[in-house]
């Protein structure tokens, strides 16, 4: 009887080890994917296309499910850029990655899981609009977070 129990205990131990290894593997692969920095920016007046997955929004996409309106200019480029920066700062959990005369790039970090989302603003001075792109670095669905972020930033920008 004791030998059977020891055998059952060994099986349980091996199952526990396998589960811990699998969970660790998922955690490590998620961590690596979250840290991988995508190639972004503006090429010929266009932000990078949105991915095939539904976890992104852009003012320059042709996909109606991911489309958002560009931000209108304020008085000039500088006041517009200041307004965008103010809205981003108010939103929080953000780090600026790149700033150029006509471009801002940020990384927003989600609350619970600490996922990184890339957010870009392209200041189209000729058309007096600011194009926007927000995309999750990993996963399939963002449960609407990128659109919510856009709405919050847009509303704050328009009110201030």
Set out the residue ranges of the language-model regions.
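Ser/Thr-rich, low-complexity intrinsically disordered terminal regions
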Residues: 3-16, 25-160
